[in-house]
């Protein structure tokens, strides 16, 4: 098995300028992602895909393979799957095609190396099939939500669920966005990170912090200083 970690780190960011190069605990977001992949001990190649020369240079300094992403794959509306496919194609021009893909978003800077290794082990012990999502327990249970229809609001599942306690409902999770693991061929065939069966690894609340706004950045810096991570 050959495992590749791809870190998508485009240059454009409206909420936080040069977001992927801002520092948390003395390291940029992209460098933290690279280091967590290397320290996991299960990743053979670390690739950073970016349209930004400064990010690509930072990736090289940190020991990653830097792949320049075309501008048309780096806009606000570009699909992440297209950027991954491009990175895999460019990587495979100089290396054998890897078997396992790990996607690491740099905007989850408190993700632990042990989480990456645990997620990959979940994938391999299940025959390298399906996918593994990093998840966190849903703050609001989906059975207690509504769908807007022409006839008014309708419960997602049933009226009875709206009054049930959380303990009576099945455990529900949301994607943390911190890590995805999938077979490379399955990804290329389906052009999707979602391949059934979907398995999961529950991450900590601090690992699930996603840096999207200045407030998020302040929060993650505070957590990093408190936990020395």
Task: Please give the residue ranges for each predicted region.
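Short, structured coil segments at secondary-structure junctions
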Residues: 42, 62-63, 149
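Hydrophobic helical membrane-anchoring modules
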Residues: 201-202, 206-229
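N-terminal glycine-rich phosphate-binding loop and ensuing alpha1 helix
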Residues: 2-49
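Active-site acidic Asp-centered loop
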Residues: 104-105
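Alpha-helix/helix-capping structural signal
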Residues: 53, 185-186, 215
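Short active-site oxyanion
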Residues: 42-47, 130, 206-208
């Amino acid at each position: 098995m050959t495992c590749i970690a791809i870190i998508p780190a485009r240059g454009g960011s409206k909420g936080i300028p040069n977001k992927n190069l801002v520092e948390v605990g003395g390291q940029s977001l992209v460098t933290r992602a690279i280091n967590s992949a290397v320290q996991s001990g299960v990743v053979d190649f670390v690739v950073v895909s970016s349209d930004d020369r400064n990010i690509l240079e930072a990736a090289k300094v940190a020991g990653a393979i830097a792949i320049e992403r075309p501008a048309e794959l780096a806009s606000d509306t570009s699909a992440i799957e297209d950027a991954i496919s491009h990175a895999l194609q460019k990587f495979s021009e100089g290396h054998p095609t890897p078997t396992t893909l790990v996607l690491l978003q740099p905007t989850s800077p408190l993700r632990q190396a042990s989480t990456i290794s645990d997620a990959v082990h979940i994938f391999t012990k299940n025959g390298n099939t399906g996918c593994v999502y990093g998840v966190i327990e849903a703050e609001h249970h989906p059975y207690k939500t509504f769908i807007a229809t022409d006839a008014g609001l309708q419960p997602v599942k049933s009226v009875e669920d709206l009054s049930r306690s959380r303990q009576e409902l099945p455990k529900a999770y949301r994607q943390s966005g911190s890590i995805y693991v999938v077979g490379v061929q399955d990804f290329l065939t389906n052009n999707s990170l979602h391949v059934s069966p979907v398995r999961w690894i529950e991450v900590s609340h601090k690992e699930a912090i996603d840096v999207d706004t200045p407030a998020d950045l302040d929060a993650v810096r505070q957590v990093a200083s408190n936990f020395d991570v």
